[in-house]
A protein has these predicted regions:
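Short, flexible segments with low predicted structural confidence
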Residues: 103-104, 153
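Class I SAM-dependent methyltransferase SAM-binding "motif I" and its flanking Rossmann-like core
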Residues: 124-126
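Glycine/charged-rich beta-loop-alpha catalytic/anionic-binding loops adjacent to active sites
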Residues: 143-151
């Protein structure tokens, strides 16, 4: 059993955590609901995300079970949370005990501020690569969909978190399982979007 904890906060980019949430919960469902996937926030009550979606956390930062995987999303709220000692301290402490720490988009900046990304190779949203690199003590890997460095995994922006999450469940449960999850959620990142040439993969689910 794997326990995933996805940090949320006001201004978090929705797909940064909803994409991995879909991957993790589908993985659990296909394995007879073997895992626990949780949304965690500093406070109770609705969290208003970057584009207006409101979500409710399952637990607060001081009242959740131990985590195997910690995921930190980006969004404009992530830059604000860099000045929040409660959140950065919690990330630092929780990352130290988790088997995996993950960051999506500008969540890499928050992970750098908190500590786990320092001294590591990381990916982030292309618009923030220079800003992250300027912070020092980090190697920004450009043009990489996601980067694995030790037990830290980071991805580019928004939808890239889905690819990162698929890699992680493939590492934890096997590549065949990850392929089954990808087919189940019908995630087909190639070929690129073509407005006048809709296509669909009609292959069955193994």
């Amino acid at each position: 059993m794997t326990t995933y904890g996805l940090l949320i906060f006001d201004g978090a980019e929705e797909l940064d955590f909803v994409g991995p949430w879909e991957v993790f919960t589908t993985s659990s469902m296909l394995r007879h609901h073997a895992d626990t996937v949780l949304l965690l926030a500093e406070r109770t009550g609705a969290i208003r995300c970057s584009n207006g979606m409101r979500v409710l956390p399952d637990h607060t930062l001081d009242g959740h079970p131990p985590l195997d995987v910690l995921l930190v999303p980006g969004g404009e709220g992530a830059r604000r949370e860099m000045a929040n000692d409660v959140v950065t301290g919690w990330i630092r402490e929780t990352s130290a005990s988790a088997a995996w720490t993950a960051g999506v988009c500008t969540g890499a900046l928050l992970l750098h501020e908190a500590g786990p990304a320092r001294g590591h190779n990381v990916a982030t949203h292309f618009a923030f690569e220079d800003a992250l690199e300027a912070r020092g003590n980090v190697t920004v890997v450009r043009d990489a969909r996601y980067v694995v460095d030790g037990n830290l995994i980071t991805s580019q922006g928004v939808s890239a978190g889905i690819d990162m999450a698929l890699w992680l469940i493939g590492h934890l449960h096997g590549r065949d399982h990850a392929r089954t999850v990808r087919r189940y959620i019908q995630y087909e990142p190639a070929p690129p979007y073509l407005a006048d040439e809709p296509t669909a993969d009609r292959s069955g689910i193994d």
